[in-house]
Design a protein with these regions (language model features):
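Acidic-and-aromatic substrate-binding clefts and catalytic sites of carbohydrate-active enzymes
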Residues: 16-24, 52, 117-129, 148-157, ...
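Acidic (Asp/Glu)-rich catalytic clusters
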Residues: 22-43, 58-67, 136, 165-169, ...
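Catalytic domains of cell-wall/extracellular-matrix polysaccharide-remodeling enzymes
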Residues: 88-161
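Active-site beta->alpha N-cap acidic-glycine motif
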Residues: 1-50, 120-121
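Structural preference for beta-strand elements that scaffold enzyme active sites
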Residues: 37-41, 116-118, 140-141, 173-175
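Catalytic grooves of carbohydrate-active enzymes
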Residues: 95, 102, 106-118, 175-200
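Short, solvent-exposed beta-strand-terminating loops
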Residues: 1-3, 40-76
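Aromatic- and acidic-residue-enriched carbohydrate-binding clefts of CAZyme catalytic domains
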Residues: 8-13, 59-89
């Protein structure tokens, strides 16, 4: 109805209800939390750079519109499914990211009953300017790869900030660095097990 000029997010529990055989997923997660099997962490309100996505939809990209109509992702030329939620095209976008993060952390606490103590940015990229809102909402650890990818205003061009496990930044947030990289969906033909073992 808005001709792709406005973005509406959806609670992930509603999304789970729409997928076949996922209607019990959240209750299983709750059992896992109760039994100490896993602990959720904040990854974002959505895993989407929605402004770029809306721009492609507004432009009438047929493939993107087809995917939208069928409720699936679009991995077209350039931007990889628009998944890098905290990347930006204009420095002013960071202020909106802060609001989205604050809202997402509020939702996280309401959904799970506790505040997230850690954060991992979608696609491992974020502007250090968002870290204050993370801290003020209870986050104590920033999880990522060995190198943080800081947005520059151009997709897939980042300033690299190296980090090490246990490093403490100026805000007192600590870095939890993954000791290996496992993203099988990126290269389905790759032997990810051997790759991970080699990295460890």
């Amino acid at each position: 109805a808005s001709n792709f000029t406005k973005f509406y997010f959806e609670d992930f529990r509603e999304t789970l209800q729409k997928y076949p055989a996922h209607d019990k997923a959240f209750s299983i997660w709750q059992q896992g939390i109760t039994n100490g099997v896993f602990m959720p962490q904040f990854h974002g309100r959505e895993h989407l750079q929605y402004k770029r996505w809306l721009k492609v939809l507004q432009a009438g990209n047929k493939d993107a519109l087809y995917c939208f109509d069928h409720g699936t992702t679009y991995s077209g030329k350039g931007d990889y499914s628009f998944m890098e939620a905290y990347d930006w095209d204009h420095p002013g976008d960071v202020e909106e990211h802060k609001k989205i993060i604050a809202e997402g952390l509020f939702l996280f606490k309401n959904v799970f009953g506790f505040a997230s103590k850690s954060f991992i940015a979608p696609c491992y990229n974020w502007d250090p300017e968002i870290e204050g809102v993370l801290k003020s909402n209870g986050v104590r650890w920033l999880q990522g790869l060995r190198n943080q990818m800081v947005p520059t205003g151009s997709f897939d061009h980042y300033t690299i900030l190296p980090h090490y496990f246990g490093e403490v930044n100026q805000l007192g947030l600590k870095y939890n660095i993954r000791n290996c990289f496992l993203e099988p969906s990126l290269l389905p033909g790759k032997d990810w097990v051997d790759s991970c073992l080699a990295q460890i």
